[in-house]
Amino acid sequence: MVIMEGFKIAMKVIDEIDKKIKPLIGWEKADEVVKIGADGTPTKRIDVIAENMAINILEKFSGGILISEEIGLKVVGDELEYIFILDPIDGTYNALKSIPIYSTSIAVAKIKGEDKKLIRENINNIDWIKSFIANKYTINDLYVGIVKNLATGDLYYAIKGEGSFLEKDGEKIKIETKNIKDLKEASVGLFVYGLSNDLLEFLKERKVRRVRLFGSMALEMCYVVSGALDAYINVNENSRLCDIAGAYVICREGNAIVTNKNGKPLNMKLHLMERTSLIVSNKYLHKKLIALFGNRWIIKPVKFGIVVREDKEEAINLAIEICKYLKDKNIPFCVEDFLRERVGGDKFDISAISHIIAIGGDGTILRASRLVNGETIPIIAVNMGKVGFLAEFCKDEVFEIIDKVIYGEYEIEKRSKLSCKIIKDNRVIKTPSALNEMVVITKNPAKILEFDVYVNDTLVENVRADGIIVSTPTGSTAYSLSAGGPIVEPNVDCFIISPICPFKLSSRPLVISASNRIKLKLKLEKPALLVIDGSVEYEINKDDELIFEKSDSYAYFVKGQSFYNKLSRCLGIK
């Protein structure tokens, strides 16, 4: 009875806004910004009018707590029965421009009996009520959700335990997500403000059949349940509680999976300023979308692989402490053979590992990257060396980040790698990928080499030098930096070509897009070496060609301090 009463009151709000807002579409004053809303965004006149209508209905027919973008939190009516989460107009721009994709949405939770007295005792202390509601109630306490397209009249609604429904053209239809399994067949709605590299790549590579941008988050979530879309994605942490509350209930009751971009279920507090990223889809597409946009490792079982610098006792001692720490927490781990006699653990098996802890300097971290060998295994890079440009953590931070990994409270940074093919006597030799750089250098000291440098088959320069470096952005702080190359932020999609001690002063480092193909051709009858990340070597001779491209594989790091903090530390600035 209480549930149906809450639903009926919410429907009265929807109907009143629907009836009174339609005449305002096209009214020139509807577009005026009249204030800054409680959520910190500009509020249009049409939003205020819609919100005031909702307040009038709630005060007349009910009572409780209203949370809305414009007013913030308000106690309405005499009775403390319900919590209402309202978005008066979702898609305000569409409404003002007569684009028929805008909605009003509302969600309802029941105030628990024991909480009513406490709220009433503090009825004049709005800050206390905000804090109390936020600490006691979450989005999962909502049991009614309603979203109405005010332009078409399509009405989506759900009541907890009863499923989700669409009323359209006088017909009531039970709706739930479709069972499409292949991303290539999927239609996906996107929120694209603040495009990430992952999202740009997703669009560029056409990983789905079609992409749509409608501009009304609540409706787009409902479209996933009705089958008009197969997924909705917002990778930014800006989906607001009021934007999604009503649609969240409809999605939940319509068998949609709704999580943040990392696959963690939503548990948003009922507070105006709550924000989240969002992936909504059926169960078949969901893990695939998490793998594209989020931290897929959060939803994997954790087993650590320990890689440590063998000749540094301090690094070995830290590895022993880490292994003991993991044992005490009953977290499985595996170690290399030289360490197993001292700490136990399983034999090192890359196929069984979810994360690698690399303890040492940049050389150890590069070795860990080679052990990963193209697998999508994140590295926790712990600095025990002298500089540590690749390391994200110092030894004092390692136990804290291990706990964060165990509990899924961390982020991943994806780093591009460099691939190379050697064309020698009409044979093609494919080398391992490089995380830092590939260097072509004279095999005999003090002997100059000569190269033709091509970008996409266009001859860019003839270089005479001791060698030449092709570096990733990650490697820009390594050998390339010593050769006069620029420092490049790791998420820039580029490569750096840096001559080593060039004969001509005009031979300068060159930064090019990672979408290009680089070709080096050795011109002199002098033996040379291709050295990959300072360890793997190939002999190069006259007329051999080296083709460098962006690798299909990436390196993944558990994210620590910002790049610029790390840069200033490594350069001795602070």
From Swiss-Prot:
Free-text comment on the cofactor: NAD kinase and pNPPase show maximum activities at 50 and 20 mM magnesium, respectively.
SUPFAM superfamilies according to UniProt: Carbohydrate phosphatase, NAD kinase/diacylglycerol kinase-like
Pfam families linked to this entry: Inositol_P, NAD_kinase, NAD_kinase_C
GO cellular component term, pick one: cytoplasm
Main location: cytoplasm
Region feature (NAD kinase): 302-574
Active site: D362 (proton acceptor)
Temperature dependence: Optimum temperature is 100 degrees Celsius for phosphatase and kinase activities. Both are inactive below 60 degrees Celsius.
Keyword Cytoplasm: yes
GO molecular function, one term: fructose 1,6-bisphosphate 1-phosphatase activity
Keywords: ATP-binding, Cytoplasm, Hydrolase, Kinase, Magnesium, Metal-binding, Multifunctional enzyme, NAD, NADP, Nucleotide-binding, Transferase
InterPro entries listed in its UniProt record: ATP-NAD_kinase_N (IPR017438), ATP-NAD_kinase_PpnK-typ_C (IPR017437), Bifunctional_PpnK_predicted (IPR021175), Inositol_monoP_metal-BS (IPR020583), Inositol_monophosphatase-like (IPR000760), NAD/diacylglycerol_kinase_sf (IPR016064), NADK (IPR002504)
Residues where Mg(2+) 1 binds: E69, D87, I89
UniProt: Mg(2+) 2 binding residues: D87, D90, D243
A GO biological-process term: NADP biosynthetic process
Function (record text): Involved in the regulation of the intracellular balance between NAD(H) and NADP(H), and is a key enzyme in the biosynthesis of NADP. Catalyzes the phosphorylation and dephosphorylation of NAD and NADP, respectively. Although it shows conflicting dual activities and is able to supply NADP, it seems that its physiological role is to prevent excess accumulation of NADP. Kinase can use ATP and other nucleoside triphosphates (UTP, TTP, CTP, GTP) as well as inorganic polyphosphate (poly(P)) as phosphoryl donors, however poly(P) is not considered to be the physiological phosphoryl donor.
Protein name per Swiss-Prot or TrEMBL: Bifunctional NADP phosphatase/NAD kinase
